[in-house]
Amino acid sequence: IVASLASYGFARYSGKLRSLVFFSYVILMLMPYQVTLVPNYLVAEKLNILNTYWAIWLPGIFSPFAVYLLTKFMKRIPVGVMEAAQIDGAGEWQIYRLICMPLCKGALCSAAILVFIDYWNMVEQPLILLSDAEMHPLSVFLSKINSGEIGLAFAVATIYMVPSLLAVSYTHLR
């Protein structure tokens, strides 16, 4: 939802500042996570969310990839539809909520799935931001399994795929 709000602003308005901020989103999207690891750690420390699930969830909520994907989708919504809504008396919030969001449902589902899978597969972030091993996701446990424990590795890998498959199945039904 946060990404859709930012995307609406990027898609609907133009200007030098908008272009600069959107370009910074694209640069952040292209950077590997390891480059932003120290700043993310410092922000999590400042917000006092180290060793909590929020340290993992917040970067996903503000994902630059989701903003980029949704912005590109929202730019394809005909301007005439939004202008017609304005003529009918709709404000910005109503245009966003009643026109853009229903039209972007497929893009929202795609962005949610891709961001979820991206953060579900992370290993470095939980290792750095979560000191309690019980809070680590399966991706960390899967990376620690030795090659001699092949049966355990396949069992964990099968369990590891279930949340992603459920997320795809759930959004496919929508």
Where are these regions (language model features)?
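A structural signal for multi-pass alpha-helical bundles of membrane permease subunits
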Residues: 1-174
